[in-house]
Amino acid sequence: MSDLKIALTHADAREERTVTTGTKAWELFQDDPSVIAARVNGALRDLAHELADGDQVEPVAIDSPDGHDILRHSTAHVMAQAVQQLFPDAKLGIGPPVENGFYYDFDVDTPFNPADLDKIETAMRKIIKEGQRFSRRVTTDADAISELRDEPYKIELIGLKGSGASTGSTTEAVEGASVEVGAGELTIYDNIRRNGDVAWSDLCRGPHLPTTKRIPAFKLMRTAAAYWRGNEKNKQLQRIYGTAWESKDALEEHLHRIEEAERRDHRKLGRDLDLFSFPDEIGSGLPVFHPKGGVIKRVMEDYVRQRHVEEGFEYVGTPHIAKEGLFYTSGHLPYYGEAMFPPLDVDGMDYRLKAMNCPMHNLIFRSRQRSYRELPLRLFEFGHVYRHEKSGVIHGLTRVRGFAQDDSHSYVTKEQAPAEIKHLLDFCLGLFRDFGLDDFYLELSTRDDSKPDKFIGSDEDWAVATKVLEDVCIASGLELVPDPGGAAYYGPKVSVQARDAIGRTWQMSTIQYDFNQPSADRFDLHYTAADGSRQQPVMIHSAKFGSIERFIGVLVEHYAGAFPPWLAPVQVQAIPIAERHNDYLYDVAKRMQAQGLRVEVDDSDDRMQKKIRNAQLLKVPFMMIAGDDDVAAGAVSFRYRDGRQDNGVPLDEAIRRVADAVASREQV
């Protein structure tokens, strides 16, 4: 045997090692049970991978992001094996890892029910206990088709190998398919029993755990219907979702987070707190705000409008529809056509519901000659836009078909662009802090160089724009995560990702550098420079919340419906102990309303404790309770949402407490 030299990177330390020919990756990590795979020369590999001379090797721990994906992918295989044991006629779709879990799609005659999931879990535990080995083997297209002749969906994937498998498919479906086939060699994974028999096989690129025994904790979560490859024209399959974690404690923590997320679900709270609804008569993805929800929306919009003015923006307004040709000029047609509603025939001419505001803002800029002295020129509006979202992705307020976008466009010189992007990023982060979100990271979306037909503009323009955004992000000191291929067709973007009270991440602001729409081929925007020459501005798109509706949904869940006083629909619930105290509290309410505070008096026939309970259920920040002694003293019992109560508080003091809490924009 000859010696091989490899480099092992572990815990930020690099070690040169000499090993013998035939050494497998697992031999480097025998003393570390947390390692379940290896990254060899940048590519994820099974621990059974044979090393070569010069390899750069890194361990992959089960609790790392890559480790989670491998664990969940392997668990998906075990689940599919169990399903085919219990339901021999089930045909396999795809089974990739996803955020916090995995799924597998099956073609079965009857949808799975909860009892089926229990049986599948039991069968999975037996497979895990057996310690079946995941074994990779390379095959040819012809051999794979022969071996998998009873699996029509797998054969279809083999036919799509290397083609991208994307025609008519959702992004999730494309990514799921890529787990099974890709542009490289075709592989099958066998689950092998200890006696050497093959228990089950699946078309897959891997990598996988060494054995099924390395699955510490899992749970099947739910079932759903899903179209094959995410295309509504294809057959509807049955999908089983599950989750897997590196320990039972980690699984329990995840399940607790799910319970907490369900408790905070904005759709349920919106109904319970009478904030908004989704009437079938109007249509899917088109929310209606009730009076209390309307208060939150108005307060948010008023504050955001005020802050934009303070930051140098000018408020504008544009219509909901426009001639179709406008969107060809901007490039949204054809690049963004699938997300737009079909054309409307108006007097023999095609119009479109707008899906974005930027083309109309460009027309405002172009409406007269502009001077360099006017730049940066910042335009802003709450523009109502409409997106043709598929019904399967619509979700409460966070994914809708019609929404108000807090949309702004800055027109700047190339030299002003870095400072303007920094200004916009600081503005966005400050707004989120005002609304109680203060845990962020940034994501930089760039173009996919392998798909030039999906992007417009020169390589040089893209390089300059990307560098400007990247420099500003790095200077912010926030974590920066790359998102290759995620850019808009007209330029790169940075998005602010905010974590809520239970650690979930939400994409919030987007800031996009656009060198295309101002160009002569598009809107031909220009300004007169100091030397009298005609120059093209850079256009910077920015949506602070992306969607007012979506941000309200996020805040409902972040606060679990218990809004800080400045946002609460009702800031004070006045509770008379008896009917004779009603007039006193109505006078108190008028006094507070004159100061702009939102007060309601509960003059129902309910007993006082029931009134307090009702106010707690509505998550009202403050209660003012009055009886005979309070009326005589010109005071109230001042009660907080958390149950604390101060008795005999003079009216002036009670009102000041509320006003100060509202002005501070802090939670109580």
From Swiss-Prot:
Disulfide cross-links: none
MF (Gene Ontology): ATP binding; metal ion binding; threonine-tRNA ligase activity; tRNA binding
Needed co-factor(s): Zn(2+)
EC code(s) of this entry: 6.1.1.3
Region (Catalytic): 265-564
Places the protein is found: Cytoplasm
Ranges of residues in domain TGS: 1-61
GO biological process: threonyl-tRNA aminoacylation
Subunit structure: Homodimer.
Annotated protein name in UniProt: Threonine--tRNA ligase
